Amino acid sequence: MGLPWYRVHTVVLNDPGRLISVHIMHTGLVSGWAGSMAFYELAVFDPSDPVLNPMWRQGMFVLPFMTRLGISKSWGGWDINGDSITDPGLWSYEGVAATHIILAGLMFLASMWHWVYWDLELFRDPRTGKPALDLPKIFGIHLFLSGLLCFGFGAFHVTGLFGPGIWVSDPYGITGRVQPIEPSWGADGFDPFNPGGIASHHIAAGILGILAGLFHLSVRPSFRLYKALRMGNVETVLSSSIAAVFWAAFVVSGTMWYGSAATPIELFGPTRYQWDLGYFNKEINKRVQASIASGSTASEAWSRIPEKLAFYDYIGNNPAKGGLFRAGAMNNGDGIAAGWLGHAVFKDKEGRELFVRRMPTFFETFPVVLLDKDGIVRADIPFRRAESKYSIEQVGVSVAFYGGELDGVTFKDPTTVKKYARRAQLGEIFEFDRARLKSDGVFRSSPRGWFTFGHLCFALLFFFGHIWHGARTIFRDVFAGIDPDLDEQVEFGAFQKLGDASTRKQAV
């Protein structure tokens, strides 16, 4: 059969046995990819510095998803928090990757078996003897089984009743770890940042799926509904399945990009809105002010700020700063973070504290402007020095560092002050190693950005796929040009006059 590449699935349209075979093979390919990709990422992942070189800076894609489900240990003797371990067991990165590859092999064998033994009695309608699938019953079976899985995940895995729990963190991504979750059954369960909602919603959705599955197994659709929704056509199944997938892809694109309890910043990196809103900057300043109010010096207050929190407050970790066509991990852009230099405080010669205006997300270059506490421009780095009135040299700006590696150091040299003013545009100032990976200095996106972009593209593609296959199954008679109820009347040679049932030819 000379089919074009986009029509090859036609061969399994009316062949239930081989339809199952290709689906098993597809599941095996997905499972094999997941296991293989996990092993690849483990081979290139550096677990030595979970604070300044976390998985999302290294461009890991599979590892964050494994970690959020409760996997945190490796056969390499490390865990995700940088500690040494002795007995990781099967529930480890390598253990789960290996089980996926083994599953892929079993799926491959099962697919081969179903391809060879395609003509099973199970797939034949006992009334007609022709290949047929009881699609409403199959729908009920799948709904029941997926409901069981959903309920089991929420009731056992997430709650820790039989499982590790999931990754839970504080709002600022400092204290994250794997722990059991208590289901939230109140209105707070609908808060997208409340992990308790993950448990309760899986339990509730699982129960609903089980009940709906039992309903569809025990109640047959009316003939009118069966005909109206084309329940006898396997392309109806394809169309509605694609609808479920594209809807899920749109939803997870949103929860990833805007952030949620299921997409913690310790595993996927911060969101762009946390930079836009000064989320970490406000928290850092709040902690510093509280420390100073309790009697600490500025140096002591800034030294208490966790390096992890300071690193989040850096524009290079904003997923919207990396272009969609800049391939590679964040570390391939600005380099591997080596250390926090400390918080830079600028002052003019009159003693006023100045604040560098931070670069907005969608700027590649931005003027260096220093403002006082009232928002008045006091200094800048001018484009045309001949007309400048607020240059660093004219205003006499100095910079002092609190906390970090340069704690207590002050610079008054205009060249050095300008260097740190430019870097302060990008948030907290860090030192980067650009030599090790030959980093090019151009920002990259995090797995959060890549996941969102990929799933939005696939969701759009699958949306059109749903429309296409839905239209094909609903309007099949229109596209064929023949009413399915008139097939005998228009059969060539059945009647003396085409379409006239009163002129049927007599068999000789």
From Swiss-Prot:
Signal peptide: none
Membrane protein topology class: Multi-pass membrane protein
Membrane-traversing stretches: 21-36, 101-115, 140-156, 203-218, 237-252, 457-472
Record bears the keyword Transmembrane helix: yes
Cofactor: how and how many bound: Binds multiple chlorophylls. PSII binds additional chlorophylls, carotenoids and specific lipids.
MF annotations from Gene Ontology: chlorophyll binding; electron transporter, transferring electrons within the cyclic electron transport pathway of photosynthesis activity
GO BP, sorted A to Z: photosynthetic electron transport in photosystem II
Keywords per UniProt: Chlorophyll, Chloroplast, Chromophore, Membrane, Photosynthesis, Photosystem II, Plastid, Thylakoid, Transmembrane, Transmembrane helix
InterPro entries cross-referenced by the UniProt entry: PS_antenna-like, PS_II_antenna-like_sf, PSII_PsbB
Compartments it resides in: Plastid, Chloroplast thylakoid membrane
Chief location bin: plastid
Domain of life the protein comes from: Eukaryota
GO CC list: chloroplast thylakoid membrane; photosystem II
Database matches in Pfam families: PSII
HAMAP family for the chain: PSII_PsbB_CP47
Known role: One of the components of the core complex of photosystem II (PSII). It binds chlorophyll and helps catalyze the primary light-induced photochemical processes of PSII. PSII is a light-driven water:plastoquinone oxidoreductase, using light energy to abstract electrons from H(2)O, generating O(2) and a proton gradient subsequently used for ATP formation.
Protein family per UniProt: Belongs to the PsbB/PsbC family. PsbB subfamily.
Subunit structure: PSII is composed of 1 copy each of membrane proteins PsbA, PsbB, PsbC, PsbD, PsbE, PsbF, PsbH, PsbI, PsbJ, PsbK, PsbL, PsbM, PsbT, PsbX, PsbY, PsbZ, Psb30/Ycf12, at least 3 peripheral proteins of the oxygen-evolving complex and a large number of cofactors. It forms dimeric complexes.
Official protein name in the record: Photosystem II CP47 reaction center protein
Organism: Mesostigma viride (Green alga)
